[in-house]
């Protein structure tokens, strides 16, 4: 053979291994498969047949017509492997060739076998003859270039063996390849003269294997509709979450309801089956609603991508014939250009739903074969083509493919894909069909902060392209369990990164086959990254690319065809294109009516049936995950180059990134002549300027037509477009050209839409610009010198992935910030830098703080010595140690004042881990050295009136080391109280052997975040011996002192002029914070980088919060408090002290203003405030009445510079100090910081914003606050995404879901107050609620201006304070009393101001000019404003005692008021007493030798209460926590003795399960002796009759209570060894559950509920039972039954309130508090005082028993009855307890309460005297005695109000009523005795009775009646699951008991008596007498 020297392409057989090429093998080996057969032809003919068959086989598997392979002849076989040669043979043939002509042309070259390496051009070989020597060598040479060898042994029965390398071909493929080869060889030998094209290549064995692989595919589609499957989920799980989106969540029930509205609207407009409705939405939950609404209407939908050019959208809408389009409100304007009818969802749909007139067109339901949606893809004709997918196809695919993708009802699916791609439809609908949840990030989150959005939305299933997955970290999204990748091939590294952490699936599917056609499930680390898995839902067939009627053998490349029910209907309006790719009944498919889609993808099939993607056979390509039809781009581009040939191709540039290149055949005769042969593709060198001008114009035009990903990056002119031999564009040549371009050649033809745009920006030369360039280069893997100002980021190789990476990098440069949108919108690097710069501070901020301040120079120079002496005295140091003294900043003063009020507040605790080799002594020295250079660390704060009239001073102490405490690891950290005069910093060194820790404790008055970093830097520098920097704080204080107060006052006055803001929340007592009621909740917002250059994140957050407040107050004028870093002024950046400042921020929202304009205005506003931000709240408050209103803000917004941990973790402190997370401290710190009813703290992080809300739960519920945060999230996302939208549009789109906002406004708005007032006062009266500032006050008051025609203007012409006459005056007084005593959640007016209705405001159409009303009211004192209601007895009280007058003068001085303006009963907080004022007030009191703490001031509500506190300070201390069983030690000594004793009393319970035990109190024992086994119960009705109660949830809620309260797990048992004692034994868990009775009849429901639950003689069980009863109609009752006086009424009320909160999913109190045992311990100590019994002996001396006699015919039963009412019920003889109700309506409740308030009487006193009057009339006795129940909760025990147990007692109430005494005197006497009885209330009644009656042995009791005054056991005002008490029955040892329940407007008395005692008529008489007695007292009042 002759060697021929010409170039041919390599002929490399493809790898057919399903194992990873990187997987190592234990040894070198080869797979071998042999076969033999008998032949009758010559050996030469056989070998030629084998060679020819091998050629055909290689041609099929390499998809080539030029075949090259190696041959080893028989003579070479016996040689040594070093000498063996291989001849390379080449064959070229055509399908029309005759077989004899297809022979190897010649031997081209020879190779030494052992020299064959990886660079070989062939990898297959035929060996003819013996092969033993070199074959062994080949098997043991793993890197040999030959991978496949066919060995032929000649003979009568030729034997052939195929050897393959395991790393190259798996064993199954070897067998399949042998089968194919043998089949080809048989055909060749049988038809030696035939044509090549007639040779059948695919054997039947392969065909059968393919049939087996497709056998699981469904033959028929699922006959279902998408919306029907979703509707079933809605019915099955209506409350389950269907959508979790950035703009709100939606349950399945809500989704069903909202989509039904859309359906109704569409059907009303004639939309039905086969109608196509386009949808134009941004990422939103409403997209899902619109999609489902269209499907329900029977129509099909098309999702439009908002970012696409309008021309493309118009083309699609024209193609579908759109008449109606659904849009969001933001897209409505664009939508109006696309269809005749435009409707936004939800706004227009809700407003324009058709009325129910019965004329709606009949609904035609969609059928499974109707179109469900149309998905548009790129089209080769220049227009996108729409694929029609039917319901049946989509449902089949969803049901079949979901299991393979691990998609199910528990999946929370990320909706990431653009609406332009059908994957978005799969992500949206399939989860809903399965019962899962669709999670939708915003457009900004999707691009800028995807990882954070995934966490926030709790995504656990997502489908992404590999390019996007590279942005994510598996460790940072731990909730994600399944990742599906598709759209492009995944790299081996990316596959390995994910496969080890979560379930990784690879999905494949063209839009024509319903999204997902093939899945590679559960990919392992060693899986094939090119594999697209196996068919699911559709059958898989691989055919010859040019002939779909011929199947290729398994393993050979071919075009992928997908068949089955998932194949779409075809292309809309394109029958030719449909027929070309949607084929029917090919010859290899036996079944009829089978449809297949030709994907155009070239693939091959592995031996296990999986498919490997190889590429495309046509011009459709994938670029960055996007499917692109090159023909469409070419079609559109040709319009910009008329007459020129164009071609578009994708190729990899020099930097490895793919690029879209447009080639243009630039007509130039000169160049055409020079182009010929091999250089015909040479680019044009001349005429470049003209061409580039055209190229820029073309790119700009294409950007308006095509999506951005289809616009070419580079446009290149060519002499001619290269063509292939078939006269088609030679795309391979174009791709090769792209690959060969150098960097300079690429830059030569990069085109921008406006290449001159960079000229607008000057040359940049600076550190920040250079740093940004370095980051661009690093992201793009370039050298910085290659990045020039005019370069475009994307033309340098950037893409969306690198844009996100660059955005994150830029954010690390101070004062620079870039969003991804900024990068996309920047034409050049210069513009990129311009966009990244933040707005600098103006020069007007100069001058800054002074550089140096002399010691003591900020004090009065004449008093410096006095200052030093006093400071030394307060700090406990010598005067010589005082280094400096200067005032505190306003915030420091407030922080210390709050700490005085609440010890422990504002103290930071930080744990630092230390390395094991830390030098502790040196570290201690380093801290003290740092304190030398940071005076703030040596600073203490003092508060003394002698120095600064109560204004705190800070004292810098020298020669005092930082307090340093060393403890062992096992010891607890010592607590040092920080207060005035004490050190405010100390360190605790824990010298643990293996984990040493340093704990830093420091008060916030000393540091902020900047100072914290300064401290750590200074300690590190000192430890390392480096120089330190002096950082004083006094210069900043001087700056604050030197602020021009007049300018500041003028500024703040101007700032709040005309303020119309409504305080939020409208709490009842403004300014009074209840720390025990503070709760918190947290929400994380996914936060993209803001896309407004120069706008700070703070401005964005402030705007969003202002919009939230606007939504909740209904006002566009909002005010809230804000705390800032205070380091905006020059020189403040490095100040060594806390500079944070708080001030009220006012923001007015303007509906016509764009978001961009509003942000800029807010930012400029913040800059204007900066010079005055240190003014302090107290100074701002005094600048004007409006300023005072602004300073009374009820909500605070705090924006941290960053999360403390995330910042500090980045500090270079290792290995000295490593900060540990101390989340619990942060939470407690913010709780202590919560001085307002609502405090919102924002902590920005990397791509997210953590927002915590701390709120007073007595004012706001958790649900309300969470809704506000969700509203804030929605608004912030809208602000970020739509900067050009108007404020009005954004506000209208951010309404709270499900009407929650409306409900809140209804509950809190001033409108409700005005409405109720009008209803109360009747017709002819007008009302307006206005916030005013009365004269001599600085606290806003809510006033109710009332206008009526009957009012007359006062004589001096003032238009307010009109004369008020009866009956209006009485109605006004009653109304105010009702509002103030029964707030019911509304805003509560402080005063009422009558106004004549004839008054005409300056603004027409309004009853009242609010501005003028505020101004007029400010001229009068509060006393004057309320003078109209005075009738000789004013509610304003002057001091009665000298002490009260002293306190009033002190407070008046602090508040700058006249003493006469303050009443001794005025609320202190309402007067303006905040923490700082309280501190100053305490200092003034100290000046008068009155020692008051700030806590005492706030505990008192008025000066009178404060005077009472001073007169008698509480003696009790809070009860310390007790050890378990501690109270039993006096009785048993140890626990074992207790268990042995008590086990005998327990029936069936293991006493070792107890966790505590303690004895009963003496008071409880006294009750037990009388009550015996008396039982009580209360029955409630739950909810409304229409409300269905979930009994399972209700029972679980009660068991939750049982776990929370030890009392509900407590046995009450008698002690065997001490018979007089009973014990409480607390179990670890409850042994009894909840009794649930269902399916009862309504008529018998209450009767069955009354049946007893507890046995009367059983011991050892729980002393209570809880049961729930429900009727068949849903009416629900619950019952609590108890005995042994186990629970008092107050405990039942506590339990019911907590049960309601649990059912309403609201937080409850701390489960560790309170403890009933602590109350028992207190009482045992209390009982040791003998004075208590001595009081009762003295108080009841001479008393005769007061016994109400039984009815005449009941006398003989009375004694018998008393013996029976504790006995068992036998034979029906047990006495019955009868209860009768008598509702007593107090006609003038206002007068009664006023009478009580004026004389310091209580309602209980009134009722006791009334019962005494009743007994006097019934018995004729004047010395009355009866039992009176007391709650027992007015003791100094922590949280006694929430203790559950038996705290009550029955006291002997003695009231002497001689005829000479008036009722008033009796009331006053009894009120005094009530206080004395309360001081001794815990004595056992049994002991008291025995003590008093010791001289009367014939008497057994002091009385037989009892009075109980209680709060209602159900609160009708409560929201949520209401409990309405139906009946309460309490068995008692008394013959008759009166239970009076006091409601705000009535008193309801129930009289209970034993059947043996009296009859109903007698009971009615007693009740009537009691009612008359109450009325008699009221008349006397």
Curated annotation (Swiss-Prot):
Kindly list the biological process annotations in GO that this record carries.
amino acid activation for nonribosomal peptide biosynthetic process; secondary metabolite biosynthetic process
Molecular function GO terms recorded: ligase activity; phosphopantetheine binding
Region (Disordered), start-end ranges: 1754-1774
**Which SMART domains does the record associate with it?**
PKS_PP
| InterPro entries attached to this UniProt entry | AA_adenyl_dom, ACP-like_sf, AMP-bd_C_sf, AMP-binding_CS, AMP-dep_synth/lig_dom, ANL_N_sf, CAT-like_dom_sf, Condensatn
Its Enzyme Commission number?
6.3.2.-
- Residues covered by region (Adenylation): 251-638
A cellular component annotation (GO) from this entry: cytoplasm
**Region feature (Condensation 1):** 883-1293, 1586-1978
Q: Which residues carry this modification: O-(pantetheine 4'-phosphoryl)serine?
A: 800, 1475
Query: CDD domains in the record, alphabetically?
Result: A_NRPS_SidN3_like, FUM14_C_NRPS-like
Q: What does this protein do?
A: Nonribosomal peptide synthetase; part of the gene cluster that mediates the biosynthesis of okaramine B, a prenylated indole alkaloid that possesses an unusual octacyclic ring system, including a four-membered azetidine ring and an eight-membered azocine ring, and that exhibits insecticidal activity against silkworm larvae. Within the pathway, okaA acts as a bimodular non-ribosomal peptide synthetase (NRPS) that condenses two tryptophan molecules into cyclo(L-Trp-L-Trp).
Family, per the entry? Belongs to the NRP synthetase family.
Q: What is this protein called?
A: Nonribosomal peptide synthetase rstn8
């Amino acid at each position: 053979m002759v060697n021929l020297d010409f170039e041919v392409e390599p002929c490399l057989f493809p790898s057919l291994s399903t194992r990873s090429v990187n997987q190592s093998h234990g040894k070198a080996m080869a797979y071998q498969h042999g076969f033999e057969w008998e032949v009758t032809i010559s050996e030469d003919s056989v070998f030629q047949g084998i060679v020819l068959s091998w050629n055909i086989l290689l041609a099929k598997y390499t998809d080539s017509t030029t075949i090259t392979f190696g041959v080893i002849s028989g003579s070479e076989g016996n040689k040594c492997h070093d000498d063996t040669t291989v001849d390379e043979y080449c064959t070229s043939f055509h399908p029309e060739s005759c077989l004899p002509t297809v022979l190897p042309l010649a031997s081209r070259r020879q190779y030494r076998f052992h020299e064959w390496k990886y660079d070989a051009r062939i990898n297959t070989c035929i060996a003819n003859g013996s092969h033993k020597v070199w074959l062994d060598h080949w098997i043991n040479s793993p890197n040999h270039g030959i991978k496949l060898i066919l060995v032929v042994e000649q003979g009568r029965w030729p034997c052939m063996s195929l050897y393959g390398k395991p790393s190259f071909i798996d064993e199954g493929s070897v067998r399949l390849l042998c089968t194919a080869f043998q089949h080809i060889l048989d055909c060749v030998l049988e038809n030696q003269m035939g044509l090549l094209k007639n040779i059948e290549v695919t054997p039947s064995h392969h065909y059968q294997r393919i049939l087996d692989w497709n056998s699981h595919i469904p033959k028929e589609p699922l006959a279902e509709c998408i919306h029907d499957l979703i509707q079933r989920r809605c019915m099955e799980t209506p409350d389950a979450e269907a959508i979790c989106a950035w703009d709100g969540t939606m349950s399945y029930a809500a989704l069903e309801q909202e989509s039904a509205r859309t359906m109704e609207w569409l059907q009303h407009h004639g939309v039905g089956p086969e109608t196509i409705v386009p949808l134009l939405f941004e990422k939103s939950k409403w997209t899902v609603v619109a999609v489902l609404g269209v499907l329900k209407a029977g129509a099909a939908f098309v999702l439009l991508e908002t970012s696409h050019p309008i021309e493309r959208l118009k083309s699609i809408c024209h193609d579908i014939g759109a008449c109606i389009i659904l849009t969001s409100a933001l897209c409505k304007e664009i939508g109006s250009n696309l269809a005749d009818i435009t409707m936004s969802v939800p706004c227009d749909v809700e407003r324009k739903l058709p009325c129910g007139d019965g004329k709606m067109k009949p609904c035609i339901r969609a059928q499974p074969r109707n179109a469900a949606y149309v998905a548009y893809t790129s089209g080769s004709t220049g227009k996108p083509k729409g694929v029609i997918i039917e319901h049946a196809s989509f449902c089949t695919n969803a049901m079949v493919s979901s299991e393979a993708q691990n998609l199910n009802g528990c999946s929370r699916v990320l909706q990431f894909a653009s609406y332009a791609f059908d994957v978005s439809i799969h992500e949206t609908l399939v989860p809903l069909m399965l019962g899962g949840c669709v999670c939708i990030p915003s457009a900004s989150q999707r691009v800028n902060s995807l990882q954070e959005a995934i966490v926030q939305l709790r995504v656990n299933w997502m489908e992404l392209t590999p390019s996007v997955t590279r942005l994510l970290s598996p460790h940072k999204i731990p909730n994600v369990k399944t990742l599906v990748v598709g759209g492009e091939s995944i790299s081996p590294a990316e596959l390995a990164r994910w496969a080890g952490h979560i379930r990784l699936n690879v999905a494949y599917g063209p839009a024509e086959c319903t999204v997902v056609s093939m899945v590679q499930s559960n990919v392992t680390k060693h899986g094939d990254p090119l594999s697209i898995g196996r068919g699911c839902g559709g059958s898989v067939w691989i055919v010859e690319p040019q002939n779909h009627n011929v199947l290729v053998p398994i393993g050979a490349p071919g075009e992928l065809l997908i068949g089955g029910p998932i194949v779409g209907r075809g292309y809309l309006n394109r029958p030719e294109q449909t027929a070309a790719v949607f084929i029917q009944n090919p010859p290899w498919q036996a079944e009829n009516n089978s449809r297949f889609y030709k994907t155009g993808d070239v693939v091959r099939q592995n031996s296990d049936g999986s498919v490997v993607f190889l590429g495309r056979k046509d011009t459709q390509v994938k670029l960055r995950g996007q499917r692109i039809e090159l023909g469409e781009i070419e079609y559109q581009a040709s319009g910009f180059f008329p007459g020129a040939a164009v071609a578009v191709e994708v190729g990899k540039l020099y930097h490895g990134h793919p690029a879209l290149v447009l080639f243009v055949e630039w007509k130039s005769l000169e160049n055409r002549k020079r182009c010929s042969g091999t250089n015909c593709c040479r680019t044009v060198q001349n005429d470049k300027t003209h061409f580039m001008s055209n190229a820029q114009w073309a790119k700009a035009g294409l950007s308006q037509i095509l999506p951005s990903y289809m616009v070419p990056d580079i446009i290149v002119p060519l002499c001619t477009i290269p063509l292939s031999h078939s006269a088609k564009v030679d795309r391979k040549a174009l791709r090769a050209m792209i690959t060969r371009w150098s960097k300079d050649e690429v830059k030569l033809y990069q085109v921008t839409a406006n290449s001159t745009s960079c000229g607008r920006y000057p040359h940049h030369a600076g550190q920040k610009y250079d740093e940004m360039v370095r980051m661009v280069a690093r992201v793009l893997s370039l050298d910085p010198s290659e990045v020039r100002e005019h370069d475009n980021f994307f033309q340098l190789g950037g893409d969306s992935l690198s844009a996100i990476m660059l955005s994150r990098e830029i954010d690390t440069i101070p004062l620079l910030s870039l969003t991804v949108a900024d990068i996309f919108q920047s034409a050049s690097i210069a513009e990129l830098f311009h966009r990244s710069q933040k707005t600098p501070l103006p020069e007007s901020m100069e001058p800054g703080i002074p550089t140096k301040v002399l010691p003591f120079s900020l004090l009065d120079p004449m008093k410096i010595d006095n200052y030093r002496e006093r400071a030394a005295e307060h700090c406990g140091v010598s005067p010589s140690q005082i280094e400096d003294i200067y005032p505190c900043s306003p915030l420091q003063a407030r922080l210390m004042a709050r700490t005085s009020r609440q010890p422990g507040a504002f103290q930071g605790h930080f744990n630092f881990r230390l390395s094991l080799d830390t030098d502790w002594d040196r570290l201690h020295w380093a801290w003290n050295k740092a304190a030398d250079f940071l005076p703030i660390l040596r600073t203490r704060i003092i508060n003394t009136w002698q120095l600064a009239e109560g204004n705190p001073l800070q004292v810098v102490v020298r020669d005092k080391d930082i307090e340093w405490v060393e403890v062992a690891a096992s010891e607890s950290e010592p607590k040092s109280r920080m207060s005035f005069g004490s050190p405010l910093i100390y360190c605790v060194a824990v010298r643990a052997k293996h984990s040493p820790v340093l704990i830093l404790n420091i008060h916030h008055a000393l540091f902020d975040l900047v100072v914290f970093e300064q401290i750590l830097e200074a300690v590190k520098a000192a430890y390392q011996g480096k120089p330190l920097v002096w950082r004083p704080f006094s210069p900043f204080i001087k700056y604050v002192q030197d602020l021009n107060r007049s300018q500041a006052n003028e500024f703040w006055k101007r700032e709040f002029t005309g303020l119309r803001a409504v305080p939020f929340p409208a709490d009842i007592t403004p300014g009074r914070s209840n720390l025990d009621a503070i709760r918190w909740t947290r929400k994380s917002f996914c936060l993209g980088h803001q896309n407004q250059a120069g706008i700070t994140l703070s401005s964005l957050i402030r705007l969003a919060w202002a919009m939230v407040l606007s939504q909740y107050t209904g006002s566009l004028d909002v005010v809230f408090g804000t705390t800032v870093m205070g380091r905006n002024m020059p020189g403040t950046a490095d100040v060594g002290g806390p500079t944070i400042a708080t001030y009220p921020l006012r923001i007015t929202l303007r509906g016509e203003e764009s978001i961009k304009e509003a942000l800029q205005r807010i930012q400029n506003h913040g800059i204007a405030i900066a010079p005055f931000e240190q003014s302090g709240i107290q100074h701002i408050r005094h600048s004007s009445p409006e300023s005072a209103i602004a300073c009374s803000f009820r909500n605070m917004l705090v924006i941290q510079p960053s999360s403390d941990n995330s910042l500090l973790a980045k500090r270079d402190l290792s290995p000295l100090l490593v900060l540990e997370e101390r989340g619990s401290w942060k939470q407690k710190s913010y709780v202590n910081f919560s001085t307002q009813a609502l405090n919102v703290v924002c902590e920005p992080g990397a791509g997210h914003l953590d927002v915590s809300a701390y709120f007073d739960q007595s004012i706001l519920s958790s649900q309300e606050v969470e809704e506000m945060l969700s509203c804030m999230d929605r608004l912030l996302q809208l602000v970020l995404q739509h900067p050009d939208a108007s404020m009005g549009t954004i506000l209208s789109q951010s309404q709270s879901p499900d009407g929650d906002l409306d409900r809140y406004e209804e509950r809190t708005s001033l409108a409700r107050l005005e409405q109720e007032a009008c209803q109360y006062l009747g017709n002819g009266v007008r009302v307006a609620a206005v916030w005013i500032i009365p004269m001599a006050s600085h606290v806003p008051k809510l006033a109710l201006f009332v206008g009526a025609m009957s009012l007359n203007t006062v004589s001096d012409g003032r238009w307010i304070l009109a004369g008020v006459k009866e009956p209006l005056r009485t109605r006004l007084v009653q109304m105010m009393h009702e509002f103030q005593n029964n707030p019911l959640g509304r805003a509560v007016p402080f005063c009422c101001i009558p106004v004549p209705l004839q008054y005409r405001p300056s603004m027409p159409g309004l009853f009242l000019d609010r501005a003028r009303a505020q101004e007029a009211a400010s001229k009068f004192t509060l006393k004057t404003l309320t003078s109209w209601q005075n009738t000789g007895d004013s509610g304003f009280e002057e001091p009665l005692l000298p002490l009260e007058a002293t306190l009033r003068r002190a407070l008046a001085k602090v508040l700058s008021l006249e003493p006469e303006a303050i009443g001794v009963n005025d609320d202190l907080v309402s007067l303006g007493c905040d923490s700082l004022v309280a501190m100053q007030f305490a200092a003034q009191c100290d000046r008068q030798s009155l020692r008051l703490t700030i806590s005492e001031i706030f505990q008192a509500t008025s000066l009178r209460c404060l005077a009472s506190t001073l007169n008698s300070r509480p003696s009790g201390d809070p009860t310390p926590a007790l050890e378990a069983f501690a109270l039993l030690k006096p009785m048993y000594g140890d626990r074992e003795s207790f268990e042995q004793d008590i086990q005998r009393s327990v029936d069936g319970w293991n006493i070792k399960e107890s966790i505590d035990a303690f004895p009963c109190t003496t008071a409880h024992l006294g009750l037990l002796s009388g009550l015996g086994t008396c039982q009580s119960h209360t029955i409630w009705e739950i909810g409304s009759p229409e409300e269905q109660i979930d009994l399972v949830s209700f029972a679980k809620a009660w068991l939750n209570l049982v776990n929370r309260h030890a009392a509900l797990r407590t046995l009450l048992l008698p002690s065997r060894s001490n018979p007089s004692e009973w014990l409480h034994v607390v179990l670890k868990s409850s042994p009894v559950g909840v009794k649930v009775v269902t399916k009862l009849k309504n008529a018998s429901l209450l009767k069955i509920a009354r049946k007893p639950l507890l046995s009367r003689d059983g011991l050892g069980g729980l002393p209570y039972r809880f049961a729930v009863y429900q009727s068949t109609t849903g009416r629900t009752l619950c019952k609590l039954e108890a005995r042994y006086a186990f629970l008092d009424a107050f405990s039942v009320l506590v339990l019911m309130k907590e049960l309601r909160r649990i059912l309403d999913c609201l937080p409850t109190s701390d489960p560790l508090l309170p403890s009933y045992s602590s109350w028992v311990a207190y009482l045992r100590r209390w009982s040791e005082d003998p004075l208590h019994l001595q009081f009762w002996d003295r108080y009841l001396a001479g008393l005769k028993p007061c016994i109400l006699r039984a009815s005449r015919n009941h006398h003989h039963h009375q004694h018998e009855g008393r013996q029976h009412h504790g006995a068992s019920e036998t034979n029906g003889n047990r006495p019955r307890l009868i209860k009768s109700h008598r509702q007593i309506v107090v006609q003038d409740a206002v007068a009664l309460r006023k009478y009580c308030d004026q004389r310091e009487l209580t309602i209980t006193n009134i009722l006791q005297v009334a019962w005494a009057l009743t007994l006097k009339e019934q018995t004729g006795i004047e010395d009355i005695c009866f039992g009176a129940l007391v709650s027992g909760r007015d003791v100094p025990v922590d949280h006694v109000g929430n203790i559950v147990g038996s705290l009550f007692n029955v006291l002997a109430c003695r009231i002497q009523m001689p005829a000479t005494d008036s009722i008033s005197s009796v009331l006053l006497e009894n009120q005094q005795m009530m206080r004395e009885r309360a001081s001794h209330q815990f004595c056992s009644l049994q002991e008291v009775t025995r003590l008093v009656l010791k001289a009367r042995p014939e008497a057994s009791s002091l009385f037989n009646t009892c009075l109980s005054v209680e709060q209602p056991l159900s609160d009708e005002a409560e929201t949520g699951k209401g409990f309405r008490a139906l009946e309460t029955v309490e068995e008692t040892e008394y013959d008759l008991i009166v239970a009076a329940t006091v409601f705000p407007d009535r008193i309801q008395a129930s009289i209970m008596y034993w059947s043996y005692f009296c009859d109903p008529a007698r009971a009615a008489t007693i009740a009537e007498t009691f009612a008359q007695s109450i009325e008699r007292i009221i008349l006397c009042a």
